[in-house]
A protein has these predicted regions:
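Short, Lys/Arg-enriched N-terminal segments with co-localized hydrophobic residues
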Residues: 15-28
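Hydrophobic cores of alpha-helical transmembrane segments in multi-pass integral membrane proteins
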Residues: 33-53, 86, 229, 246-273, ...
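Perimembrane loop-to-helix junctions flanking transmembrane segments
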Residues: 66-70, 330-344, 637-640
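Post-cleavage N-terminal segment of exported redox proteins
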Residues: 27-75
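Soluble extramembrane regions of membrane proteins in the secretory/endomembrane system
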Residues: 56-247
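Hydrophobic or amphipathic alpha-helical targeting/insertion segments
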Residues: 93-97, 102-141, 371, 378-448
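Membrane-interfacial, low-structure loops and terminal tails that flank and connect transmembrane helices
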Residues: 275-300, 458, 594-604, 769-775
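Non-cytosolic membrane-interface motifs at loop->transmembrane helix junctions
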Residues: 423-431, 494-504, 562-573, 639-645
Length: 776
């Protein structure tokens, strides 16, 4: 994630995906720290203020829903009860709400809203004209549609009493939808990849549909004294007047203009200040050859072994999940869904991705810890082993709990929340497992922190790099905490706000900066770059990235029941996130150049190539495909379609997964620098993994997503997610095309896992030598 160009008296840095900086002056380090801290404080102040507005203006949850004829349609607490039913069944892993979730089953908000609108239109058509709504004349239909839009968009929520008053026709529509969803969840649906008996309790089904009703009501009812709904008119539904808001269009334009201007400024800066590189400090021999591993460094080997196995298991779950999308409930005809339903395999697929990537990064941090202070802290190996056991407990315990929750093995109490499935994508694990993971991260912070604090007492030129390393470590450990900030009965909009703190800030924010610092340490240990110069680059890298990344969290919340202020800030600052990614080509070139600086660096060639792949996927997966869906007007039509999957695979695996593989390889190389690697196998795995991912995206996910987008724009969001569209011959063929890329990717992954495990279980001979010196 970092490459640096240096001169003796000044330094031009290409940092974090290609951003450039000209280093001059003796007070530069101090100024960079002030810049980073200012960005950090100001950005979180804005994000926090927007959060207070989100909480204040979240869609109200009615105390009860009552028809004008006095019938109580939804009694007290039934909507929140329904949200809990939805969560325990798998929540976002079985369809989506407000566009957030999985892709095979419908978006339940859009589906309920469309079915309700159709029912009302047909009910009125039969009553007034004696015929079905589909047979009305244009004039007759226009009259009823205008009436329908008035009905659906008028906000009849009584703030003083907490009641929502609805027309009796909406109560009849509710009962009709209840019957439909009862059939879906009781009998199962192959079109939706929902297993038979997913939910057969009639009481819970009524609660579930009450929750669906509320999300649909909030998506169409205008905010008080406004002409847009609580979700900024998402999802697209022409029948009820849900069209893009003016703010969505205006802020899209602003974000695009800002992006172009920022890229232009960066090109201007680079063209004016780029200098040649001085590599005179690179040693003639590998400084790691002959170094003795500390006990804690040896103890990290089992972490990398688990990384390999979890990576493989994630691929297996992905293969099964993809087949469910085509076959409905099986794998090549084998009916697995009654034992291992889609909602479980997809949960495990997404969660295992987070687990193995995080494990790789945590292990890399633990491996580097002795490098920081130059010695092995007391009981460090014991701490590393305890943390390993805790991580295994969280992984296995959370997976078992999720299966039990979905399969109704945890009873009717609250155990589903504490030990089962919370229903929120990427943070699906039960609260107990969440808390255990947080405690494990604090232990990891302690293990690394004591090494860093000891090193900070020494007067060396790498103190800023160590302090930055400690800060990013603290960020990773502490910023998982927002995942504990919501409760079992928390408002969905509030949950979404904190959830994206974890998914975006934790994974895409602090992991990104942590990776920059870790790689800086690794290259500094090899003496390819100087530690103080690396600190300059890493500090400015973090400042620039976080200036867009922190507030850019809000781009996930455009339509989650949030006010327009979230859309405005999110669109502008998410555009700034893209700017560094445009220059990743420079990073790739510099990484390759570093690998050729001395003959001995050739043994790091394929490690460096994995870093180059990170730069490539940063541009394509995070940059191109990220900005494809980030502008408000684009996300309005694309959210929750396969275009989202394109970005998710290209960014989460492409950037963070590839970086996890690269860090694993780097540590394994550093453990045995004198060992000869089977580079043919590693080269094959590298090309197969990356080509396979490209095939998966361009042969299947992207074409499906673009066709869905066209359908969403021309017909409505509900249609783009409907089985009538997704089960057409063209879409089915495109889904099967994914098998080509998946197969190539899986073969490459198998080769990588075999290569890595072979290194770990058959260690080469090492030459005894004194303990390594700290980074100079």
């Amino acid at each position: 994630m970092i490459t640096v160009i240096f001169m003796r008296d000044s330094a031009v840095h290409i940092y974090d995906d290609g951003i450039i900086f000209l280093a001059v002056g003796g007070d530069l380090m101090k100024k960079l720290w002030i810049l980073l801290l200012s960005v950090f404080i100001l950005s979180f102040a804005i994000l926090g203020w927007v959060g207070t507005e989100i909480f204040r203006q979240a869609p109200p949850i009615p105390r009860e829903v009552v028809a004008t004829d006095g019938t109580v349609l939804i009694p007290a607490e039934q909507i929140s009860d329904g949200q809990n039913v939805w969560q325990a069944m798998g929540g976002m892993q079985i369809g989506s709400i407000w566009g957030h979730g999985s892709y095979v089953a419908p978006d339940w908000t859009a589906d309920y809203l469309h079915r309700e609108a159709l029912f009302i239109l047909n009910d009125w058509s039969g009553g007034q004209y004696g015929k079905d709504g589909g047979t009305l004349s244009g004039e007759q239909k226009a009259v009823l549609l205008q009436h329908l839009q008035t009905l659906m968009r008028t906000n009849t929520y009584e703030e003083t009493s907490g009641r929502l008053i609805v027309d009796p026709v909406r109560a009849r529509a509710f009962e009709d939808n209840l019957k439909h969803y009862t059939d879906v969840f009781t009998d199962g649906s192959k079109d939706y990849a929902i297993q038979k008996g997913a939910q057969a309790d009639p009481v819970k089904l009524r609660q579930l549909v009450s929750f669906y009703f509320w999300t649909a009501w909030a998506s169409a009812a205008n905010r008080p004294n406004n002409t847009i709904s609580y979700t900024s008119n998402f999802p697209s539904e022409p029948m009820v007047g849900n069209y893009p808001t003016s703010s969505s269009i205006v802020w899209t334009g602003v974000s695009v203009i800002l992006l172009i201007a920022s890229i232009g400024a960066m090109v201007w800066f680079y063209a004016g200040w780029r200098k040649e590189t001085d590599e005179s400090d690179t040693p003639d021999e590998d400084p790691l050859v002959g170094a003795t591993l500390t006990p804690s460094q040896k103890a990290t080997v089992k972490y990398f072994l688990v990384v390999s196995l979890l990576f493989l298991l994630q691929i297996v779950m992905g293969v099964i999940t993809a087949h469910y999308g085509v076959e409905g409930g099986g794998l090549y005809g084998i009916p697995l869904d009654q034992v291992l339903p889609y909602v479980v395999t997809r949960t495990w697929h997404t969660q295992l991705g987070i687990f193995w990537i995080a494990t790789a990064w945590l292990a890399a941090g633990l491996y580097i810890a002795p490098y920081i202070c130059g010695y092995e802290p007391k009981f460090q190996r014991l701490g590393v082993n305890i943390l390993f056991g805790a991580l295994l407990l969280v992984v296995l315990g959370s997976m078992a709990g999720q299966w039990m929750s979905v399969m109704h093995k945890l009873g009717n109490g609250d155990l589903w929340f504490w030990f089962g499935h919370q229903g929120y994508e990427y943070v699906d694990l039960g609260r107990v497992w969440q808390a255990a993971l947080f405690i494990g991260l604090l232990l990891w912070l302690f293990l690394i922190g004591r090494s860093a604090i000891a090193a900070l007492k020494e007067k060396t030129n790498n103190r800023s790099l160590i302090l930055l390393y400690l800060g990013t470590t603290a960020g990773i450990a502490l910023f998982y905490a927002p995942g504990l900030f919501w409760g079992m009965r928390s408002h969905l909009t509030v949950v979404e706000y904190w959830r994206w703190w974890v998914v975006h800030l934790w994974v895409e924010g602090f992991f990104e900066v942590f990776a920059t610092v870790v790689i800086a340490f690794l290259f500094a240990r090899l003496r390819v770059i100087r530690a103080d110069h690396a600190a300059y680059a890493a500090l400015l890298s973090g400042a620039i990235y976080l200036s867009g990344g922190i507030i850019g969290t809000l781009h996930h919340l455009y339509f989650a029941g949030t006010p327009t202020v979230a859309l405005a800030f999110g669109s502008v600052f998410s555009a700034l996130e893209i700017v560094p990614l445009v220059f990743v080509g420079y990073e790739a070139i510099e990484n390759i150049r570093h690998s050729k600086a001395r003959p001995w660096l050739a043994q790091y060639k394929w490690v460096v190539y994995f870093f180059v792949a990170v730069a490539f996927w940063n541009l394509i997966g995070a940059g191109v495909f990220g900005f494809m869906i980030n502008p408000p007007i684009a996300l309005y039509y694309m959210q929750g379609l396969n275009t989202t999957a394109v970005h998710a695979h290209g960014a989460l695996y492409g950037v963070y997964g590839t970086l996890g593989l690269a860090l694993t390889l780097f540590c394994l190389r550093a453990m045995q620098p004198e060992r000869k690697w089977n580079t043919k196998l590693l080269a094959f795995s590298f090309w197969a993994i990356n080509i396979g991912m490209l095939m998966e995206i361009f042969f299947s996910l992207l074409p499906i997503g673009l066709l869905q987008t066209y359908q969403s724009i021309s017909v409505g969001y509900w249609s783009a997610r409907s089985p009538e569209f997704m089960q057409t011959a063209l879409m089915q063929n495109l889904r099967w095309m994914r098998m080509l890329g998946d197969t190539v990717f899986a073969i490459g992954a198998l080769a990588w896992v075999w290569f890595a495990i072979k290194l770990m279980i058959t260690p080469g001979k090492r030459h005894p030598a004194p303990i390594i010196d700290p980074v100079a």
